């Protein structure tokens, strides 16, 4: 008997179902169902993907939704809603939007809201969560009958069904009788959330994760009820209710939804005076052309503009361009900095004269066809950059312009990633945290990592998994839940604008700001035909804006970064030295190396290096550099290639060059050339053959030799995957150049602004401040009277602000600034009496003192000792002023400071690190500068010019990894007074020294300087010794206790001696013989080099508790 599954939750009922839509549809198809429903709870996330998957598989999609209907404050019931038609589908979208846009945490639709959209829907009162079953369980049969009759009266007698589930006849039969009595059709179902029974354990885990409980704490009635049943299983389970089975098919037959997918729904722009969009766009372009070019506007340029406009009009995109022009105009008028362009749109002259982009495509030989190809109808893709702190303003403007119901941001899903799935599964199963932590530490957090990949790559992970049954269970279940959606998030850039209310095509939900989110990802948005625009928040534009503002305020220079000279020697000198921290796209170690080798001296060099510095084309960077230097002869397969490739020294760098070659040599239009480029880049055999034939035939027709044409085609094929979009490269290189110019000419302003963008990232901030010092820019300490919220410039240097200090909030800083503006602060007592103690608390005051911000009020130890008394004094002052209504000023003599011993330099530094996260006024190593001279120690800065070095520094971070061979090695982040570096400790050296390494301690290291994969300098360590052992002559001794049992075994004693000799080194060994009560220091030949390997092997021989390393003072 044919039936249909009508109660199905997919993965989009978050953390409730194991049913991924492709597998769900495949399972239903394989089980020979003719139709399938989707009824996710409250949401329509999966409607379009489900519809597409069903259509592709030949299944009829039944689109529904499960929700809670609230009839009154104390009465509600779950209902299953199904779209009978496209109108019904639209009603589901609207109802889901109402539910998901509620302010309350509870999700429901009111009865009145449901009535507003009741038409074209079918309704099922579900077995679980339905009011009827609750009434039956409470023996309130009449209430249940009245409820059903109420629904029939208001929703339509033929539109309401009653659901039964499960095999318990005692629970199902009363519902059957009730249905018969009220003449309401009965339907039977599985509440499907699991496709395979073996996935039930994983299903329980995600329920536990969602509820925040342990699996063993879950209360599940009939777990079989959530499993996917075949047609036969459904027939067997509900054989007593054949009509209920048939009714599922009848319900499905009543549903007819046909979605229109892939058809663009272009929004309309309201033009003035009822002009057509085409006429208005043309008028704006003509005005913009005059502004951009003035007297330089020529017939050729006008022809290019006309051709572009003709394509835009023919493709129906005039409104689109006007919409983008309008909000870019708003951004300019609101003084919001905009990026020069992004992607292929920079190749459009229309975009340039409309001030959408700031890259002249004619000057840089950019192609419009790379953006909009008349030979290939596709939607335009204009991505726009704004400062990250002002992006929201533009989106809000768009919302107000087109209506709150026509603009939305795009949703994304956060999924259970590899490492997170292990942790969540482990927690749900109550596995000991240390077991889970060991496993998860071995799983890389890099993007794209999966548990299968991690398991295959990491031998240590495999060992841990196989070490226990519980570890294997965790891994098995984690692999099943991995990748399931866990929560919703907002796409970093995507915004949709619709001509019609969005809820006619897609459901919405609450977003983070004023603009809602689509209930569908980017793919779904495109499927339903909505036009996406990317509004990107770019931190580098924020930095640019900040630097320009500081330059104006500090130097009185009003810079227009869009009019900077592109041949500035100072800028290119900075780039040639690779000093590009903070410079967009040029910051990485590898890029700095390339810049140092290339020594760019034209803007075109920056564009080329931006295009080439990627996996694949990087191999051609040496060719480009040698061609530029003239150390390698540049050859061309044909002289006609020279005009196209000479600017890149014979290397095909850009996709546009491929298009130009095809146009020049094969007679292709630029649109056809773009199709060739796209086809070749996919590297599909048949397409490659077809394109080769077309290219060679065209080239021969143009008068080229067939053999030459074939060779040139082969060249194109070789570079097709490597070629970069030149329009994008030029646009982003423009921003890079602007930042480099500002850094070269206004370094203090640049560094102050850059530091202000990373004030809450201590590690990055510390490195940046060290670089500033190396560049000769003084970093002035925090100061109550001079510091601001962010970094500020002074004549002597850049002033450290108050915001990075621990516990110091913006409110507290404003309170402090207000106090100092009223009058100079005389003392700690004076300061406490003039600020609000609820905002500037004793904890805030302590942080200020420890960081040195209150040094102008006294010595740090003294100030710390007087905090409590200062706040008590402040209370007395404020109490008097309150009692007198502020009519009198209290003239009370401030108490004397409690006198204490001043802090030592090392104590000051320790307090600074506590308050700021790193050392501000110096480095602990400075105290040992003289003592270290005898060891030929170099500073890090001196060491960068040498190969073999001896350095001293503090270890800030220790990172331990396991190699592919399973050996352990480490990476140390170290610093001295001149900079920070990474030290690499390979397995053999690590085994010797790991035991003595601690974060926050000073060490003496020997090794060789080398450039790693990122081209950053790093130290390959040969030796690492604690500094205190070297300078204080503090030495270590190894103590071994030989018990009576061990002493009896001569062979074991011989093993100990052999082991000591194998690990010969400087550390003395002392043996205590328990039976004889005798202590003996072994001769020098038994002295050892301490390592984990040695200690572990000794523990095996004499017992862990009988191996002790201790320190002693060497008097010699």
Curated annotation (Swiss-Prot):
It catalyses: DNA(n) + a 2'-deoxyribonucleoside 5'-triphosphate = DNA(n+1) + diphosphate. Transmembrane segments: none annotated. SMART domains: POLIIIAc. Keywords: Cytoplasm, DNA replication, DNA-directed DNA polymerase, Nucleotidyltransferase, Transferase. GO terms for biological process: DNA replication. It is found in: Cytoplasm. This is DNA polymerase III subunit alpha. It comes from Halalkalibacterium halodurans (strain ATCC BAA-125 / DSM 18197 / FERM 7344 / JCM 9153 / C-125) (Bacillus halodurans). The gene is dnaE.
